[in-house]
Amino acid sequence: MQNITIINTRCANLSSVKFAFDRLGYHTEITDNIEKIQSADKLILPGVGTAKAAMQNLADLGLIEVIQSLTQPVLGICLGMQLMTDYSEEGNLDLLKLMSGKTEKLPDCQLPLPHMGWNKVHYAADHPLFAEIAQDSYFYFVHSYGVLPNPHTVATCDYGVPFSAVIQHNNFYGAQFHPERSGKAGALFLRNFVENIK
């Protein structure tokens, strides 16, 4: 059985992520222990709130360089995905720099912010994270900042303008939506991360 570890960023609804994996039959552990993080088979980097608070928490826990040096698959969720980029406009902040790109406030398109609720996700053909998930399936979003499409974009969503719904570089994967709150499609997405990503 794979060792799936949820990094305790102290700024996320960690229990809902854990329950999502529990429902799929996977054992997970929530921890900020460096040795456990480094020895995990798969890692989840969740986050809600501000980038500044999240980066400060990771710094206080001594986890920034630990995360940057990981070689196993890591899935960032919502703010956790944004933290994987170089920089955030929210607080003019350097982030984890796991892949190029920046996090910026979604443009004013006469739509309310935060972008909250169900929206369609369009993914690149044959990506293993989307195995058995219908094209343009709906996923659940809650965010005001996002990553505009770039070479690391695997899937997009549109909220007045297109933005990255999923990004990837090497072993680092990020989802702007909340798979743990996205019904059957979200459950399949988490299963695919565990089973299909090596």
From Swiss-Prot:
GO terms for molecular function: glutaminase activity; imidazoleglycerol-phosphate synthase activity; lyase activity. One of its GO terms (biological process) is L-histidine biosynthetic process. Pfam families: GATase. Its main location: cytoplasm. Residues 3-198 form the Glutamine amidotransferase type-1 domain. One of its GO terms (cellular component) is cytoplasm. Its EC number is 4.3.2.10, 3.5.1.2. This is Imidazole glycerol phosphate synthase subunit HisH. The gene is hisH.
